[in-house]
Each structure stands twice: as C-alpha cells, then as structure tokens.
Amino acid sequence: MKFLAITLIVHRPDPVTGIRKPTRDRFREVLDNALLAEELGFDGFGVGERHERPFISSSPPVVLSHVAALTRRIRLFTAVTTLSLLDPVRAYEDYATLDHLSGGRLELIIGKGNGAAQRELFQVTPDDQWERNAESYEVFRQIWRQDKVTAATRFRPELTDAEVWPRPYQQPVRVWHGSATSKESVDLAARYGDPLFSANVTHPIEPYAELIRYYRERWEHYGHDPGALAVGAGSAGLYVARTSQEAVETYRPVFEGTLAFQRQAGLPVVFETVEDFVERSSALIGSPQQVIDKVHRYHERFGHTVLHVHADASGLTDPRHRDSLELFQSEVASVLRKDIPDPPFDWGPVLPTPSTTEEPAHV
C-alpha cells in the first residue's frame, strides 16, 4: 500500500484557537507539511483545487511547482484538478511544465469539482458540468499523447492540427479520477482504463463502497484487464496516539470546533459526536492497532491500494501533528505496506512509449 498526504489549503480560523493565519503563513505551512511528508516517508503529497471560500487552493500547479523545487523524491498529486472549469489546453501547458520541472513526479486526480460559487465564477452550470469534464479530459488526454490534435469541441474553440508545448516528460502522465457522489466520474475512469480515487470523507462507508463496486463492474464492461485495476481512498481525519483514549480526547476539541463551523456555515452534519465520527467515518483516530484494523476493514470493502491522510494539523498543535504523522509512519504504514499490496504499476515516472496514431477527438 502507498500513502499520500493531501491538503485542500483550507484558510479559516483554527477550529480550536479561533485564530486565522495570514495567507502567506498558510502557504508556508503547506510547504512545510510537504517537506515533512517527504522526510517521514510518504509516497505522495497532494494539493486540491477550489475556487471559493474558505479555500486558497486556486492554483495547484504553482504550489506544486514550489513543492517540486523543495523536494526530491515524493510524488506530486493534484486532488483534484477541476477540469470541468478549465481550458484543457491551458491545463495541459501548466501540468506538462510542472512535470518537467519535477522530473516526472506528477500524478493527476481529476474531477468536476464541488461548489456552486466556483461554478458561477466560471459560468458552468450543473447541467453541463459533467459534459465539460468529459470533453476537457478527452482533449487533455489527447494533447498529452499526440503531437497534433484535432478536436470538434463544444466548450472551447475547436482544435485543428493544434500543437501544444512543451511536449510531456511522462508519456503519459498517470491520471486518477476523483469519485465522491456520482457514477459519471466512475464510468469515465472505467471507460479509459484509469485508476479511481474515492473521496471517502463526508459519509459512512456504504455510498463509497457502492461507487467502487460500480467502477469494477464498468471496468469489466469495457474489457480491461482486471489485474490492472487500481483504487485509492481518502480518510476524514488523522490522529494516532499510544492509546485510543488519548487519541479521542486530544481530537475532541478539533472535532467540536469543526462541527461548530459546519453548523454556522449551514452545512449538513453527518456525525454528531466525536465517538460517532471515530466509529462510523473513515477518520483514522486511535491507537496504531486500531488504525491498522480500520484500514483493513475499509480495504475489505474497497480493495484500495493507495490511502490518503490529511497533511494539515487542522486544529492540532504542531508537535502533536508531527508526533501523529511519525507514529502513523512508524507503526501503522509500516504494517500496512506489508499487509496490503501496492498498486499494479511502478511508483515512479511513466516511461516513454511509442507515439500513437493521431485520431480526431470525438467530443
């Protein structure tokens, strides 16, 4: 099993202290967490993309380029790239550049994105967001694979023998499809034979397990090799301590502060107490053995081989945040790496393959 640390770069008051850091300090914290993730042996570091409050993750290629300059080994993920909002040509240019600067460490998780405010900002409607996502991905995918692209697009100017530079480092970059609530992204992933990354954050296990089951069904429908299928999954929170009692009591003020924010913002509340959150959500809060057991329970339902945890302290003090990550790596990840297999591909740059025959995009 491989392990990622991911941030959406939420920028709001600390759920425990009520203090909001200056924007510059919040970005510095992201960079520090990326360095910590590499130091502790995480396999990847991811940055989300949101274009509305309370997030400041509107430019993941810029942030990841800085992370690439500071690190040497860790793979760099987007989580997720909101292709339904983006011009696929510009998205390709940004990420192909980042891929070169990082020496082929880039992996993308793509999706339509969430939030009404960012849809309004980019004039994307709920009715066309899935079509935009599919069209943008097909064009993006072809640009990465072909020197010239022709595409009869609906949501951007058509392309005719278009050349887009720089040509890529990885051939091709690995693209995962983020999945949260709907079957459209799952089917898109299965259609192209791409890996799936389940959000697995907001709700109990059942809806996510059903979408992963559907992904496997569609993967088979499209005739792909069952042995090449790969699934990743997120987690709703992380705090590992020596005992379950210590973990829950330390995390309690973090949970209660976050719950208060959700209620103030009018967001739906799924878990009313920290005990319910620990029991029924995907949060990894407890002793090392409890966390190991919980990941195994989820693996039995998902069959996932990649797991992401929160990169941010999210209300924990910096020493407790570091102690938790260190304990996770030394006593949890070390066991799970042996118990659960890796994804069915090399964890490194995708080597060049012979050029494919140019085909027009059917969008």
Where are these regions (language model features)?
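Glycine-rich, proline-tolerant flexible connector loops at the mouths of alpha/beta enzymes
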Residues: 44-66, 82, 114, 200-203, ...
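Conserved, mostly hydrophobic/aromatic
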Residues: 3, 37, 41, 49, ...
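Alpha-helix-loop-beta-strand connector modules within alpha/beta enzyme cores
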Residues: 54-78, 132, 136, 326-340
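An alpha-helical appendage that flanks or caps ligand/catalytic pockets
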Residues: 5-10, 127-164, 205-305, 337-363
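Active-site mouth loops of central-metabolism enzymes
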Residues: 13-27, 81-89, 171-181, 279-288
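Flexible, glycine-rich active-site loops centered on histidine and acidic residues
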Residues: 2-25, 85-151, 195-197, 202-207, ...
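N-terminal beta1-alpha1-beta2 module of alpha/beta enzyme domains
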Residues: 1-71, 75, 171-173, 345-352, ...
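Hydrophobic faces of well-ordered beta-strands that scaffold small-molecule active sites
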Residues: 3-5, 45-47, 76-79, 106-110, ...
